[in-house]
Amino acid sequence: MRKEWLWVGIASVLLSACIDQPPAPQQQVQQTYSGPVEEIGGAEPRYEPFNPNVNQDYKVNGQSYRIIKDPQNFSQIGLASSYGEEARGNTTATGEIFDPNALTAAHPTLPIPSYVRVTNVSNGRQIVVRVNDRGPYTPGRVIDLSRAAADRLNISNNTKVKIDFINVAPDGSLSGPGMVGTTIAKQSYALPSRPDLTSSGMGTPMQQDAPATGAAVQAIDNSQLSGTDATQPVASQSSGFLRAPTPVPAGVLESSEPVIDSAPVTPPVVANPGPVTTTPTSSAISGGYVVQVGALSDAQRAQSWQQSLSQRFGVPGKVSNSGSIYRVQLGPFSHRQQAVDLQQRLSNEAQQQSFIVAAP
């Protein structure tokens, strides 16, 4: 009998030891994204601590809103609205003065300030905006975009968008659903405003030996732009907002050949009315502006896209690569207005977004 109790005691001890020992934690396998990566523009995410004064649960018109405490995996689909000049000068939830030309947005429950990638579901255009205000409070609306952001996404009253949160770590690293398949163009300048077509015509772009002195060249981050190869046409990049553009009719920007004033003496380079196939001078490439249309992770697709754009718009172009990212650029142009004119044509005729950068 004692032996039986002894065995029962031993079994109990062993059983309790098994129960008290916590199970070994299962290591979660992080799924990596292996699809295409596209570069998009917009507000450049920077680390900003959440403002505790504007991140408390609140109530508006009898409706309670609970602030999302952990938005690391936040995504949302719904209708977007926009606000512009009618709200200029108003104070946002962060205490900033609202500027309709800034790439900002209002969201009812996301932490402030934060950054999100907004995608127009109907046309695929994407942009990064900074959330610095509360709203909208209209049923069915999930985000309120500034006029500048809405214009670049081509938002209407019935446009459905997808919101993906971008987490910015203190060291500046980016993660979250807003970074899946995306790289963000680093830029230290404001995106160009829409050109005034009534002020000047869209003339043929001219490549001069050197850009005009005193031209207002806005500061940019040139570390991501490689030297311009004049022997290849430069495709205008729309920062990957759209897929390959549709054919466009021949327009005003037919060539980028240099203009010869009167009677040149040394004529190795002859200006012809057709598209330029000769190599521009190194001084023309080393200054001026290019229009960046998009960035792809496939070199062959980027080259094909660039050649198609160069042929249809009658401008030179090239594909500039940085690591595994291939940027499609058009130009260079000696005057910024020429780049603005081409940018407007890309938007109107090909529904293609783009931005202007200084040529290396």
UniProtKB/Swiss-Prot annotation:
Gene3D superfamilies per the record?
RlpA-like domain, Sporulation related repeat
Q: Which residues form the lipid moiety-binding region (N-palmitoyl cysteine)?
A: C18
Topology versus the membrane, per the UniProt entry?
Answer: Lipid-anchor
Q: Where in the cell is it found?
A: Cell membrane
- GO biological process per UniProt: cell wall organization; peptidoglycan metabolic process
- DNA damage as UniProt keyword: no
What is this enzyme's class at the first EC digit? lyase
Source domain of life: Bacteria
**CDD domains, A to Z:** DPBB_RlpA-like (cd22268)
**What EC numbers are recorded for this enzyme?**
4.2.2.-
Q: Where is the lipid attached (S-diacylglycerol cysteine)?
A: C18
Which UniProt key words apply to this protein? Cell membrane, Cell wall biogenesis/degradation, Lipoprotein, Lyase, Membrane, Palmitate, Signal
Q: Does the keyword Transferase apply?
A: no
The secretion signal range is 1-17
Which PROSITE patterns does the record associate with it? PROKAR_LIPOPROTEIN (PS51257), SPOR (PS51724)
Q: What does this protein do?
A: Lytic transglycosylase with a strong preference for naked glycan strands that lack stem peptides.
NCBIfam families (UniProt xref): PRK10672.1, rlpA
Q: Which family does it belong to?
A: Belongs to the RlpA family.
Q: Which HAMAP family match?
A: RlpA
The name of this protein is Endolytic peptidoglycan transglycosylase RlpA
Native organism: Yersinia pestis
